[in-house]
Amino acid sequence: MVEKTEMSKFVGVADITENKKIWRMLLGELVGTFFLIFVGVGSTTSGSVPQIAFTFGLTVATIAQGLGHLSGCHINPAVTLGFLIVGEISILKAAFYIIVQCVGAIAGAAVIKVALDGVAGGDLGVSSFDPSLNCAQAVLIEALITFILVFVVKAVSDPGRQDIKGSAPLAVGLAIAAGHLCAIKLSGASMNPARSFGPAVVQGVWTYHWVYWVGPIAGGLLAGIIYRLIFKVRKGDDETDSYDF
C-alpha cells in the first residue's frame, strides 16, 4: 500500500485533478515563458553580446520575482526535469509544465515576429552553433552552461539553506547572463529547450534543433541529481561557515 501511494504521488494524478491552484500555476508558466521569449528574442535583433546576455538574465530574474510564488517560475523544461529527476515534482505536473512552456514560447515568438516584421536581422534568434563546432561539442557546451543554471536554481530554492540573504531570482538571472557571455558565440547559449523551440516553430528552422533539447536536458538532469546527492542541505548540517553578505 505504501509503495502504491508513493507511486501515485510520483505520477501526480492528484496534482492535476485535485489541486485547485494548478491552472494558475500553468498559466504562470505560460505567461512567464511568453515574456521571456518576447523580451529576450527581441534583444537579438541587433543587440551586442552583453545586451543579449543581460536582457535574458534580467528578464528571467524579473519574471521569477513576479510569478515565482505561483509555480516556482521554471519557464524552462530543463529546470522542470531537474526537479522531476529527484522527485520534487510529479511526472504529470512536469509534463503539463513543459507543454505550457512550449506553448508560451511559440506565442512569444509569434508575437515578436509580427512586431519585427520588416526589421533587418529579425530572425527571432533561432538557436544555432558556430560552424567550427560539431554537434557533440555544441551539446557538451549547452549541457555545461545549463548545469550551472539548474544547479543555481536548486541551490537558491533549497529549503534547508538559511544562509541566503540576497535575491534568489537575481542569482538565477546572473547565471543565465554568465552562460550567454560565455557561450553565445559558441553554442548559441540556449540553456532552455522552450527558448529554442518557439522561434524554431515560428521560423520553420529545425537545423540541429535536437542539440538544444539533448544538451540542456542532460545538464539539467545531472545538476538535479548531483545537487540532491551531494550538496543539498540536510538536517544537522553545520552551516556556521556559510557566507554572509
UniProtKB/Swiss-Prot annotation:
<feature type="short sequence motif" description="NPA 1">
    <location>
        <begin position="76"/>
        <end position="78"/>
    </location>
</feature>
<feature type="transmembrane region" description="Helical; Name=4">
    <location>
        <begin position="133"/>
        <end position="153"/>
    </location>
</feature>
<keyword id="KW-0813">Transport</keyword>
<dbReference type="GO" id="GO:0005886">
    <property type="term" value="C:plasma membrane"/>
</dbReference>
<dbReference type="GO" id="GO:0015250">
    <property type="term" value="F:water channel activity"/>
</dbReference>
<comment type="similarity">
    <text>Belongs to the MIP/aquaporin (TC 1.A.8) family.</text>
</comment>
<feature type="short sequence motif" description="NPA 2">
    <location>
        <begin position="192"/>
        <end position="194"/>
    </location>
</feature>
<feature type="topological domain" description="Cytoplasmic">
    <location>
        <begin position="154"/>
        <end position="163"/>
    </location>
</feature>
<feature type="transmembrane region" description="Helical; Name=1">
    <location>
        <begin position="27"/>
        <end position="46"/>
    </location>
</feature>
<protein>
    <recommendedName>
        <fullName>Aquaporin</fullName>
    </recommendedName>
</protein>
<feature type="transmembrane region" description="Helical; Name=3">
    <location>
        <begin position="95"/>
        <end position="115"/>
    </location>
</feature>
<keyword id="KW-0812">Transmembrane</keyword>
<feature type="topological domain" description="Extracellular">
    <location>
        <begin position="116"/>
        <end position="132"/>
    </location>
</feature>
<dbReference type="InterPro" id="IPR000425">
    <property type="entry name" value="MIP"/>
</dbReference>
<keyword id="KW-0472">Membrane</keyword>
<feature type="transmembrane region" description="Helical; Name=2">
    <location>
        <begin position="52"/>
        <end position="72"/>
    </location>
</feature>
<feature type="transmembrane region" description="Helical; Name=5">
    <location>
        <begin position="164"/>
        <end position="184"/>
    </location>
</feature>
<comment type="function">
    <text>Forms a water-specific channel.</text>
</comment>
<feature type="topological domain" description="Cytoplasmic">
    <location>
        <begin position="1"/>
        <end position="26"/>
    </location>
</feature>
<dbReference type="InterPro" id="IPR022357">
    <property type="entry name" value="MIP_CS"/>
</dbReference>
<feature type="topological domain" description="Cytoplasmic">
    <location>
        <begin position="73"/>
        <end position="94"/>
    </location>
</feature>
<feature type="topological domain" description="Extracellular">
    <location>
        <begin position="185"/>
        <end position="205"/>
    </location>
</feature>
<dbReference type="GO" id="GO:0055085">
    <property type="term" value="P:transmembrane transport"/>
</dbReference>
<comment type="subunit">
    <text>Homotetramer.</text>
</comment>
<dbReference type="GO" id="GO:0050891">
    <property type="term" value="P:multicellular organismal-level water homeostasis"/>
</dbReference>
<dbReference type="InterPro" id="IPR023271">
    <property type="entry name" value="Aquaporin-like"/>
</dbReference>
<dbReference type="Pfam" id="PF00230">
    <property type="entry name" value="MIP"/>
</dbReference>
<keyword id="KW-0677">Repeat</keyword>
<feature type="topological domain" description="Extracellular">
    <location>
        <begin position="47"/>
        <end position="51"/>
    </location>
</feature>
<dbReference type="GO" id="GO:0016020">
    <property type="term" value="C:membrane"/>
</dbReference>
<dbReference type="GO" id="GO:0003091">
    <property type="term" value="P:renal water homeostasis"/>
</dbReference>
<dbReference type="GO" id="GO:0006833">
    <property type="term" value="P:water transport"/>
</dbReference>
<dbReference type="GO" id="GO:0016324">
    <property type="term" value="C:apical plasma membrane"/>
</dbReference>
<feature type="transmembrane region" description="Helical; Name=6">
    <location>
        <begin position="206"/>
        <end position="226"/>
    </location>
</feature>
<dbReference type="GO" id="GO:0016323">
    <property type="term" value="C:basolateral plasma membrane"/>
</dbReference>
<keyword id="KW-1133">Transmembrane helix</keyword>
<feature type="topological domain" description="Cytoplasmic">
    <location>
        <begin position="227"/>
        <end position="245"/>
    </location>
</feature>
<dbReference type="InterPro" id="IPR034294">
    <property type="entry name" value="Aquaporin_transptr"/>
</dbReference>
